[in-house]
Amino acid sequence: MENRKATEAGQDVTMQKEDFAVLWKTIHLKVTDTYEVPPEILWVNGSTIGTLGNFSASTGKAKSKKTFNISAIVAAALKNDEVLKYSAYLPPNKRKILYVDTEQSKYHCHKVMERILRLAGLPTDKDRDDFVFIVLREQTPDKRKQIIGYMLENMPDVGLLIIDGIRDLMYDINSPSESTDLINLLMRWSSGYNLHIHTVLHLNKGDDNTRGHIGTELNNKAETVLQITKSTQDGNISEVKAMHIRDREFDPFAFRINDSALPEAVDGYVFKQPSQDRGFPLAELTEQQHRTALENGFGKQVIYGYENVLKTLKQGYASIGYKRGRNIHVDLNKFLVNKRMIVKEGKGYRYNSDFHY
């Protein structure tokens, strides 16, 4: 049995010379090579959130109006103009948009499609060649990936792929191997077909972390992760901010659903500043203070269990003179996770020394 496993493992890692020669041409980077800057296609208030050859994501809890926000992005891309706070420009040879929904019925998907066309100022009584909408609710995760892959292979002019429900392309959102494979697939699709992929994933109910191991992988690899949150001041308003972004961070904005059932910007909206405990200015601590506290608390360990993570934070930050109660350490944990100063590893959390403060 062990010999058979070893043989199978060997087959996975052994590569023929001819196969490697072909692969070498695609993986070898030389300083004399020249590469074009990836074309920018999506912006928010002047900040780039999407380029060809990359992928991004929208996250939010249930009822935060994630799909309304996605509708504005797609409408902007359809008209190559501005919708809500999103601006888009798809090159002439990349004008087609493929929208994949894995969650809703055809009735509800049809409402989304009509909403997008109305946002773009386009007629809803005429089909368009540059906007293809498919409903994969009834398919298995493997079949969904096969269908998307086949369509991309046979539709070379797709510039924007929307996947509303990335978790439905996998069986277990907490599987590290399945999550890695899916993110690698997104990267192959985006670079291989020179398009931008925008996905949708839920946030955990109890905190502001993206759901499952797939959420961790998204945060690590995505060009931009947008967070859509229902306003605590007005339940009819949703707030949009950058959870992670490679370009400069844009000012958050808010939108509501108007009488025509379309999202519209809420001008003059004042964002409520998150409350912080007096004497514990999370964002005002220096980078070195955070590093010292986390090194003293976590070291190189992976800490398992939420309460153990809080205990580790309490010990680490006490070592630099910050002794606070449990509620503050709950807020501190959220702050550190959002800043990727501590990251999920398997079912535990570890200190990430490679963070940017």
Model-predicted regions and their roles:
Residues 1-9:
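TOPRIM fold recognition
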Residues 3-4, 14-17, 154, 231-357:
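C-terminal regions of RecA-like/P-loop NTPase motor modules
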Residues 12-116, 354-355:
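The Walker A/P-loop phosphate-binding site
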Residues 50, 89-92, 124-126, 153-155, ...:
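Conserved catalytic network of the ASCE P-loop NTPase/AAA+ motor domain
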Residues 55-63, 177-264:
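Phosphate-binding/switch region of NTP-binding enzymes
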Residues 72-73, 108-116, 147-150, 181-185, ...:
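Alpha-helical scaffold elements adjacent to nucleotide-binding pockets in ATP/GTP-utilizing enzyme cores
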Residues 76-80, 116-119, 169-172, 189, ...:
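Conserved, well-folded catalytic cores of nucleic-acid-processing
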Residues 91-174, 334:
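Conserved inter-motif catalytic segment of the P-loop NTP-binding fold
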